[in-house]
Amino acid sequence: MIESLIALIAAIVGLGIGYLVAKKINDAKYEIFVEQAKAKAKAIEYEAELILKDAKNSILNAELEVKKKYEEKTHKIQKDFNQKLDDLFKKEQKLQQEEEKLKEDKEYLCKSQKHIQDLQSDVDKLKNKYQEKLDDVLKILEHSTRLTQNEAKEIILKKVEENSREQIAHIVRKYEEEAKNEAKRKANFIIAQATSRFAGEFAAERLINVINIKNDELKGRIIGKEGRNVKTLEMVLGVDIIIDDTPGAIIVSCFNLYRRAIATKVIELLVEDGRIQPARIEEIHEKVCKEFDSAILEEGEIIVMDLGLNKIHPEIVKLIGKLKYRASYGQNALAHSLEVAHLAGIIAAECGGDENLARRAGILHDIGKALTHDFEGSHVDLGAELCNRYKEHPVVINAIYAHHGHEEATSIESAAVCAADTLSAARPGARREVLEAFLKRVSELEDIAKSKEGIKNAYAINAGREIRIIANAQLVNDDESVLLAKEIAAEIQEKMQYPGEIKVNVIRELRAIEYAK
């Protein structure tokens, strides 16, 4: 029991001693923590003092900077103000000087005006004296000549008028002669300028095309069995095909440039392809016709672009390209129109006209020639009607009429086109009259045949000694073909003059086509 009590007391004493020891240790730690906190607080306080000091320095520097800028700006403003003040002072001095000058001028004007008034007064006095003297002289004259004042005046005026009329007539004749000489000189100068600034190509059309072939064996294939291929070619193409002993050459003859060009291309393609037969001939012909239509439009577009023209209807552009396959007096129509366009532009520019409008009128002045093979009427009327339909400029229409004398030229541009047309046509070697007469005769021959009902097409071949007529098998039978040939022959004999005889050949072919499905 006592031992247990002693153990308990010992435990209590131990706990007490442990508590005291622990408390002392904790008190020591607390004191250390407090000291550390105080040290940190002092460090923070020191840093704060440094920051505050830096802030004060920054504020002071900023104040100094602002004060410096303010002083600089104030100085600049003061300087500008002083400068403006000086300028105003100078202007004020200048105004004062001008004001003084105006005062002096005003005084001078007043003196001058007074002087003029004095002079005017003297002049009036002199006039009065002169009038008095004149009256005295007139009285003396009336008394001596026994003529009144009006009668004397009439005699003097009549004499003056006679003398003046002679002088005026002499002056008018002189200036009229000078004006004519000057106009002639100016016209010659303009024409010389135009012709020297434009160098056109010489373009004379032939009536034949020569196709070169590799060997003469191809001639037999082109002729075909019993001449079937060459007959088909001539009928489809509307040309003469001459195959003779000339080595390596086939000649295509036709007065129509367009048909001749198509025929040449068709034969070249057939020779290149090697398959020469009637069906293939028609197939190639159709293909080439489409290609030529596209090429004609492209040719027209190139011409229009080269001339710097715009807003031309596509149909007119196509017809411009078609002029490449038309000729007049042996001169290519497109080459002639281009020459006229360039010359007209130069002449119009020299005379103060619209160069672009003159070129437009020049290229279109013969546009009707692209239609004469398809429509009745002169190329002048056809061209004017076409341009009127597509709303071309009135100057263009006037130029079309004026270049053949159907109307008077109403503008510089129209007159320039007329002059350029004459220059182009009159150029040595530009045209051939005999060739044009032949072309006119064969065209008339085709027109007579085409005027009959039931005719699909007609081609003048063999230099106009034969007319080949393609009849519509649906409208013309065999008996009517014979009568048709006689009628056409009789009309040709009645209306045309020609050497020898002309063969009228009416061809009627009926094709029946059906497809097995």
UniProtKB/Swiss-Prot annotation:
Enzyme class per UniProt: hydrolase
Biological role stated in the UniProt entry: Endoribonuclease that initiates mRNA decay.
Gene coding for it: rny
Family affiliation: Belongs to the RNase Y family.
Segments passing through the bilayer: 1-21
Source species, domain of life: Bacteria
Protein name as it appears in the record: Ribonuclease Y
PROSITE patterns: HD (PS51831)
Any one cellular-component term (Gene Ontology): plasma membrane
EC number(s) reported in the record: 3.1.-.-
Database matches in PANTHER family: RIBONUCLEASE Y
GO MF annotation terms: RNA binding; RNA endonuclease activity
Membrane topology, as annotated: Single-pass membrane protein
GO biological process: mRNA catabolic process
